[in-house]
């Protein structure tokens, strides 16, 4: 017992001494202890290595995340472009080419009736002011004027509702334009009749061209062609109202005395307009920011260019149609941007004493009828567009018709 105790006591200090004497990372008295010590010894260095690796990986992970987000954004953008350019494969073109003869006679007779009535000075804007009260500015300038300081209303919102952060670019554009008002020969006319010619397929076959040419001011929208369709839509053009992606690509759609009224939606639109006024080529990198091909040239002299007053768009959207004001969004639209057609209708009430419409109206219950008078795109494509509230706009136009503010020559608004 004593020997064992002494032996045990003698061996225990020896074991402790050997552990104490040995360097911490070298003591290997047993397999278990060895493994444990190696684990303890390596933990600190492993933690340091892991932290270092994480630091080294952060930039590469960040780059990967950016690449992923870019690819996702590009994919969504591509899908958006495909939707915008969606065209139904089967469109009932027979409906476009056949029009009831009685309907043709009624449309032509009604157009002549409107033209033969005595013109009523200031009728349209007075009626708009009575209908919408303070939501319609009766004395609003239709085009942006060259003044020392832009109005507060012009600078309140971003394009297309205003020119906030773009005032210097607007002034630079105005410096290039020798004229900013409605042409003198039109302003001097005691009473002017406007017709806003929409792009609707309902125009095809009505043979309203002769009647439309008799209006004092004919407003056409975007790239809607005249060549080859003059029997139905006329060939007189006083104003071509559009934005870069909507401008005609063919020179034959521009006439020497046209007014080219531009709606500016985004930053690159200013660059495009500047290039068109100066008859310069648009840099390739700028073209990448448009969602479709834009015109390389607008064959008109600088005196024929105008910039639409953005307050007209603002009043049309937020005051008359009562859309919500723009909110900051990562992607998409709030459907608070009026169509060029409805904006043109409001513009016409500021320019002319009486206003008529032709080629307006979306019959969404007939998805396979032609959407435009000049192509095979179908009405069903309107279900895919994401920027405009067609239902609200139709109610607005119906209200104008009911109150007698405008006339519908083609009978498409219902």
Curated annotation (Swiss-Prot):
Keyword Iron attached: no
InterPro entries xref list: Glyco_trans_29, Glycosyltransferase_29, GT29-like_sf
Species of provenance: Mus musculus (Mouse)
Phenotype when the gene is knocked out: Mice are viable and fertile, and do not show any obvious abnormality apart from an increased sensitivity to insulin. The major brain gangliosides derived from GM3 (GM1a, GD1a, GD1b, and GT1b) are missing.
Domain of life, per lineage: Eukaryota
Class of enzymatic activity (EC top level): transferase
UniProt subcellular location: Golgi apparatus membrane
UniProt entry keywords in alphabetical sequence: Disulfide bond, Glycoprotein, Glycosyltransferase, Golgi apparatus, Lipid metabolism, Membrane, Signal-anchor, Transferase, Transmembrane, Transmembrane helix
Protein name in UniProt: Lactosylceramide alpha-2,3-sialyltransferase
Topology within the bilayer: Single-pass type II membrane protein
All ranges on the Cytoplasmic side of the membrane: 1-65
Major subcellular location class: Golgi
Pfam families on file: Glyco_transf_29 (PF00777)
GO cellular component: a single term: Golgi membrane
Gene Ontology MF annotations: lactosylceramide alpha-2,3-sialyltransferase activity
Sites carrying sugar chains: 235, 279, 389
All ranges on the Lumenal side of the membrane: 87-414
EC identifiers of the protein: 2.4.3.9
Residues passing through the membrane, by range: 66-86
